[in-house]
């Protein structure tokens, strides 16, 4: 048996079912091209019979993708299979995936047929699909709750009819790993023609076991895993592609299995899917979460600086990230602060480590995470332990034209003790407010990240805006809180403005310090 596991991605079919709004054809094509770069073997990209839009997107992707096999879903009905075949006909290589329910509850309650009738429908569907391609996949929907005798009969009949891949879905995420592994093992033991097909699994995450069930399945002989980027999908989601890929890569010595996934594309693909689908990845998500390679514990940080593999079983570079993160918090030790200062180019002779660490702990207790620009200010400007408020927002008035989409904002800002009033227009109220603030402060920065959230619950909740901005090639993080989202956005920008102002003062101090050194050395 081959040790190669086929990765079947269904982000654009099963994954899209979780979205509040469907993706456009262009967005689907973007994701499909990312999946091709990632190296998925098969991508299931839609259900052509369901709508003209789905048909168009499947056809467009099928025409474009060259290095992955493009697949479309169909029920065990000739009209579905016809639509799938027509949409896929422009592809270099394609697969038709047909399915029917096999569990007792589905057969009796949903299909209202006998199992024998359902078996005949499955056989007919597979045979019909074989008219269009040799690559036919058949799925036993709700296989996890199907009596094993019936499941064995269905699998044997589908293979005999011409299916080259047999998919065993845990459709409702009901099974546990030992149980699911036993199902796969029983199929290999009882189905006489099992060697004529690839056994696939498609596990849902209702009990949080989709990845564990999938790994157990390949340990028992399955050689295709159906999964999605970021684990998105119906209800609680699907098996996560990135987790499967990195489990098989990281534990290759133990599992003896491999995939064709280009792991360095994982982070990039995850971000793209998250953005286009408007589904943020939770911070503690395995592999691709913001905290996946972030270390806050002082003990962990110290270990990481001594040897990276003390607390990391894979590198961030392996999934396409540049580096891991050592968050500077009140739990960070002196070693971490010294290391960070060294990374920024400072030697211990440039600052007082004892004083810096004492001030660092005070600031960390107050604000939580401390950033590089905070550390520089603490090291070189004793009077700047508290954040400067060179800019203070006094008033913000916004007027919007709902028909034209143009907004006008007027701001009154205190700038170093002087009151300035400026007005500006923009593409929406936030853009207008930002333009007015930029005029008043005469300071231009580039916003690279804008996140809108809420602090509190119900009617008492405040809008919270978090922004990341670039100023002189350095990132600055600002937060704004207000009952109004536009005001919260403005306050976040003013927060960043104050941070950049302080950074300028630090830069001036460092420059004068360098000049003094040069003069002293003459």
From Swiss-Prot:
<feature type="domain" description="Pyruvate carboxyltransferase">
    <location>
        <begin position="5"/>
        <end position="267"/>
    </location>
</feature>
<dbReference type="InterPro" id="IPR005671">
    <property type="entry name" value="LeuA_bact_synth"/>
</dbReference>
<dbReference type="GO" id="GO:0030145">
    <property type="term" value="F:manganese ion binding"/>
</dbReference>
<dbReference type="InterPro" id="IPR054691">
    <property type="entry name" value="LeuA/HCS_post-cat"/>
</dbReference>
<keyword id="KW-0479">Metal-binding</keyword>
<dbReference type="InterPro" id="IPR000891">
    <property type="entry name" value="PYR_CT"/>
</dbReference>
<dbReference type="Pfam" id="PF00682">
    <property type="entry name" value="HMGL-like"/>
</dbReference>
<feature type="region of interest" description="Regulatory domain">
    <location>
        <begin position="392"/>
        <end position="522"/>
    </location>
</feature>
<dbReference type="Pfam" id="PF22617">
    <property type="entry name" value="HCS_D2"/>
</dbReference>
<comment type="subunit">
    <text>Homodimer.</text>
</comment>
<keyword id="KW-0808">Transferase</keyword>
<dbReference type="InterPro" id="IPR036230">
    <property type="entry name" value="LeuA_allosteric_dom_sf"/>
</dbReference>
<feature type="binding site">
    <location>
        <position position="14"/>
    </location>
    <ligand>
        <name>Mn(2+)</name>
    </ligand>
</feature>
<feature type="binding site">
    <location>
        <position position="238"/>
    </location>
    <ligand>
        <name>Mn(2+)</name>
    </ligand>
</feature>
<dbReference type="InterPro" id="IPR050073">
    <property type="entry name" value="2-IPM_HCS-like"/>
</dbReference>
<dbReference type="Pfam" id="PF08502">
    <property type="entry name" value="LeuA_dimer"/>
</dbReference>
<dbReference type="GO" id="GO:0003852">
    <property type="term" value="F:2-isopropylmalate synthase activity"/>
</dbReference>
<keyword id="KW-0028">Amino-acid biosynthesis</keyword>
<dbReference type="InterPro" id="IPR002034">
    <property type="entry name" value="AIPM/Hcit_synth_CS"/>
</dbReference>
<feature type="binding site">
    <location>
        <position position="204"/>
    </location>
    <ligand>
        <name>Mn(2+)</name>
    </ligand>
</feature>
<protein>
    <recommendedName>
        <fullName>2-isopropylmalate synthase</fullName>
        <ecNumber>2.3.3.13</ecNumber>
    </recommendedName>
</protein>
<keyword id="KW-0432">Leucine biosynthesis</keyword>
<keyword id="KW-0464">Manganese</keyword>
<comment type="pathway">
    <text>Amino-acid biosynthesis; L-leucine biosynthesis; L-leucine from 3-methyl-2-oxobutanoate: step 1/4.</text>
</comment>
<dbReference type="InterPro" id="IPR013709">
    <property type="entry name" value="2-isopropylmalate_synth_dimer"/>
</dbReference>
<feature type="binding site">
    <location>
        <position position="202"/>
    </location>
    <ligand>
        <name>Mn(2+)</name>
    </ligand>
</feature>
<keyword id="KW-0100">Branched-chain amino acid biosynthesis</keyword>
<dbReference type="GO" id="GO:0005829">
    <property type="term" value="C:cytosol"/>
</dbReference>
<comment type="similarity">
    <text>Belongs to the alpha-IPM synthase/homocitrate synthase family. LeuA type 1 subfamily.</text>
</comment>
<keyword id="KW-0963">Cytoplasm</keyword>
<dbReference type="InterPro" id="IPR013785">
    <property type="entry name" value="Aldolase_TIM"/>
</dbReference>
<comment type="function">
    <text>Catalyzes the condensation of the acetyl group of acetyl-CoA with 3-methyl-2-oxobutanoate (2-ketoisovalerate) to form 3-carboxy-3-hydroxy-4-methylpentanoate (2-isopropylmalate).</text>
</comment>
<dbReference type="GO" id="GO:0009098">
    <property type="term" value="P:L-leucine biosynthetic process"/>
</dbReference>
<dbReference type="GO" id="GO:0003985">
    <property type="term" value="F:acetyl-CoA C-acetyltransferase activity"/>
</dbReference>
């Amino acid at each position: 048996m081959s040790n190669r596991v086929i990765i079947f991605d269904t982000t654009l079919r099963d994954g899209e079912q979780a979205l509040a709004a469907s993706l456009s054809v262009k967005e689907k094509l973007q994701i499909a091209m990312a999946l091709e770069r990632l190296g998925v073997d098969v991508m299931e990209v839609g259900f052509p019979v369901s709508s003209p839009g789905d048909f168009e997107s499947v056809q467009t992707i099928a025409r474009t993708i060259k290095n992955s096999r493009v697949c479309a879903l169909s029920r065990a009905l000739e009209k579905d299979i016809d639509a799938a075949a027509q949409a896929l006909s422009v592809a270099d290589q394609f697969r038709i995936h047909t399915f029917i329910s096999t569990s007792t509850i589905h057969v009796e309650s949903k299909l209202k047929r006998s199992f024998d009738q359902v078996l005949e429908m499955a056989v007919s569907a597979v045979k019909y699909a074989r008219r269009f391609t040799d690559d036919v996949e058949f799925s036993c929907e709700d296989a996890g709750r199907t009596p094993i005798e019936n499941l064995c009969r269905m699998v044997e009949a589908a293979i005999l009819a011409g299916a080259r891949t047999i998919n065993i879905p845990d459709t409702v995420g009901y099974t546990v790993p030992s149980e699911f592994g036993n199902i796969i093992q029983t199929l290999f033991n009882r189905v006489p023609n099992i060697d004529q097909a690839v056994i696939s699994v498609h596990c849902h995450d209702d009990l949080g076991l989709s990845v564990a069930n999938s790994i157990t399945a390949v340990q028992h002989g399955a050689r295709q895993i159906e999964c999605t980027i970021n684990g998105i999908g119906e209800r609680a989601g699907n098996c996560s592609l990135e987790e499967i890929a990195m489990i098989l890569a990281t534990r290759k010595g133990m599992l003896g299995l491999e995939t064709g996934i280009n792991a360095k594309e994982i982070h990039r693909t995850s971000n793209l899917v998250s953005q286009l689908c408007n589904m943020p990845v939770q911070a503690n998500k395995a592999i691709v979460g913001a905290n996946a390679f972030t270390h806050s514990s002082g003990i962990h940080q110290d270990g990481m600086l001594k040897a990276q593999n003390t607390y990391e079983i894979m590198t961030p570079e392996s999934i396409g990230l540049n580096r891991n993160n050592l968050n500077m918090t009140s739990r960070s030790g002196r070693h971490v602060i010294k290391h960070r200062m060294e990374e920024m180019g400072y030697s211990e002779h440039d600052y007082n480590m004892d004083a810096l660490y004492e001030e660092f702990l005070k600031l960390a207790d107050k604000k939580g995470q401390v950033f590089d620009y905070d550390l520089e200010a603490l090291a070189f400007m004793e009077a700047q332990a508290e954040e400067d408020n060179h800019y203070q927002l006094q008033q913000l008035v916004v007027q919007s034209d709902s028909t034209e989409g143009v907004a006008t904002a007027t701001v009154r800002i205190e700038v170093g003790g002087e009151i300035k009033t400026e007005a500006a227009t923009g593409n929406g109220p936030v853009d207008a407010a930002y333009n007015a603030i930029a005029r008043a402060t005469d300071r231009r920065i580039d916003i690279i990240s804008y996140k809108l959230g809420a602090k509190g619950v119900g009617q008492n909740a405040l809008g919270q805006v978090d922004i990341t901005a670039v100023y002189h090639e350095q990132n600055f993080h600002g937060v704004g809180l207000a009952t109004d989202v536009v005001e919260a956005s403005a306050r976040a920008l003013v927060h960043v403005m104050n941070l950049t102002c302080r950074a300028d003062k630090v830069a001036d101090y460092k420059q004068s310090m360098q000049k003094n050194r040069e003069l002293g050395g003459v």
